[in-house]
């Protein structure tokens, strides 16, 4: 997990998280007042979390499919990690703060294998191997 701190005119470019299955973002703080948008086409999008495309279904689709109101502090948005997303900049004083994380889904067999590997690693370190 990591925190993201954005201030006036800062943004998060379009990206996805290819190293996992599920991603999430929770809005922790949002500026009380956002100045009017610089350009007309940004109206209503300032500071917003935007999901684009269809994830693995269509990697070339870039039309926005959903806008999430980042001012809803405390909301947790879960989404497929392959889904392209970005955060638009905002104008005004204050901070947009969020908490993000990536997660993977594994089987019990995979988990048992990881635990066994870690045990062996620990034992080898104890023996100086």
Task: Tell me the role of every PLM-derived stretch.
Residues 2-78, 88, 112:
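Catalytic core of non-heme Fe(II) oxygenases with the double-stranded beta-helix
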Residues 57-129:
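Catalytic core of Fe(II)/2-oxoglutarate
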């Amino acid at each position: 997990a990591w925190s993201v701190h954005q201030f006036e005119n800062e943004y998060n470019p379009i990206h996805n998280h290819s190293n996992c299955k599920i991603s999430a973002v929770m809005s922790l703080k949002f500026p009380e007042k956002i100045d009017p948008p610089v350009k007309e086409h940004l109206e209503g999008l300032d500071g917003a979390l935007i999901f684009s495309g269809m994830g693995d279904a269509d990697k070339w689709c870039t039309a926005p499919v959903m806008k999430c109101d980042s001012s809803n502090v405390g909301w947790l948005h879960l989404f497929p990690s392959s889904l392209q997303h970005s955060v638009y900049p905002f104008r005004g004083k204050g901070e947009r703060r969020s908490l993000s994380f990536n997660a993977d889904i594994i089987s019990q067999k995979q988990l048992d294998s990881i635990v066994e590997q870690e045990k062996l690693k620990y034992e080898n370190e104890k023996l100086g191997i």
